[in-house]
């Protein structure tokens, strides 16, 4: 009994002193966030002294605003444009890790219509969201000569695409292609924007400069635990994370989550490029500089913007979680 009591008392300080962290996603719970749910479900965050609540996003949720208002401690910034927006607007928040080395955004078309390359889509109507219009769409305009006259609204409803064989729309690698296969029983043409040369990071974790300055240890533990969660989800048994995802978002099926996870693995979304040697979450100053130069030359951002304020390398490139 004394030994049991001693063991319990030894564990209590960890539980009592676990720091509460609220983390916002940029979309609904799905395999593209599997590493975070895996870190919660398997106790990885707890092992790092953190009590993490993951809040899913959605079309009516603006977690960036909640982060800036202090209602979230960390959130997912979808792409590098959002990080540069912080700098442009002189907002004291920045990226502390980039979980996706490749942006999983895709353009999707029907097979057999001649719409199987990015170049072939020039001048043709394409359904995209308002966020995409101010994001990687600008890369496609500069790279392939697309124009805004091609834009048609995308409302995250597949019906317009499925009813028109000439339709082209945006999507995410691990979701819309699967739904199209399941619904229409056809294999769509899927073109990964990153494969066309888009170098922006994706699924970045952002937090405040104040937190980085005043509690760098928490930031370090949160990033390292998240990275460990991702290695566990990709290379181990994803069942614990998937169970939490389904609890949060009952629309997720086992088949869809398996497809999403396999898409991440097959295309090296998390562990390619610099992450192959420096670990998931890796970032490089040279890549940030090149990305800024490209979007500056497209007129999206002004000359003289200090892109180094968009990120910090303090918590990444340390091979955290590798081999686990």
Model segments located where?
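Positively charged n-region of N-terminal signal peptides that target proteins for export
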Residues: 1-4
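N-terminal signal peptide c-region/cleavage motif recognized by signal peptidases
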Residues: 13-15
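Ligand-binding "clamshell"
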Residues: 19, 85-96, 148, 163-166, ...
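Short, glycine-/small- and polar/acidic-enriched structural segments
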Residues: 20-154, 158-163, 167-174, 199
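Sec/Tat-exported extracytoplasmic proteins
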Residues: 40-43, 48-49, 71, 76-79, ...
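Periplasmic-binding protein-like
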Residues: 99-108, 185-212, 223, 261, ...
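Secondary-structure end/capping motifs
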Residues: 213-298
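Conserved C-terminal helix/tail region of periplasmic/extracytoplasmic solute-binding proteins
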Residues: 285-324
């Amino acid at each position: 009994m004394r030994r049991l009591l001693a063991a319990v008392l030894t564990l209590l300080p960890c539980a009592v002193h676990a720091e509460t962290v609220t983390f916002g996603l940029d979309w609904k719970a799905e395999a593209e966030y599997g590493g975070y749910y895996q870190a919660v479900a398997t106790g990885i965050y707890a092992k790092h002294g953190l009590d993490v609540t993951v809040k899913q996003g959605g079309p009516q949720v603006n977690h960036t605003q909640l982060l800036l208002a202090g209602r979230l401690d960390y959130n997912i910034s979808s792409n590098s444009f959002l990080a540069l927006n912080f700098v442009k607007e002189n907002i004291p928040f920045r990226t502390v890790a980039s979980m996706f080395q490749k942006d999983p955004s895709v353009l999707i078309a029907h097979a057999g219509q001649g719409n199987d390359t990015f170049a072939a889509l020039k001048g043709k109507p394409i359904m995209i969201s308002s966020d995409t219009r101010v994001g990687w769409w600008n890369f496609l305009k500069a790279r392939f000569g697309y124009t805004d006259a091609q834009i048609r609204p995308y409302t995250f409803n597949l019906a317009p695409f499925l009813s028109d064989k000439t339709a082209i729309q945006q999507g995410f690698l691990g979701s819309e292609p699967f739904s199209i296969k399941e619904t229409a029983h056809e294999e769509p043409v899927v073109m990964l924007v990153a494969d066309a040369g888009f170098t922006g990071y994706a699924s970045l974790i952002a937090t405040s400069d104040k937190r980085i300055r005043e509690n760098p240890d928490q930031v370090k533990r949160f990033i390292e635990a998240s990275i460990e969660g991702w290695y566990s989800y990709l290379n181990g048994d994803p069942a614990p994370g998937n169970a939490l995802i389904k609890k949060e978002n009952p629309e997720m099926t086992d088949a869809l989550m398996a497809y999403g996870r396999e898409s991440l693995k097959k295309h090296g979304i998390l562990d390619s490029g610099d992450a192959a040697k420096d670990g998931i979450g890796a970032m490089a100053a040279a890549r940030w500089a090149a990305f800024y130069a490209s979007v500056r030359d497209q007129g999206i951002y002004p000359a003289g913007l200090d892109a180094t304020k968009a990120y910090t390398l303090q918590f990444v490139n340390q091979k955290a979680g590798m081999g686990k």
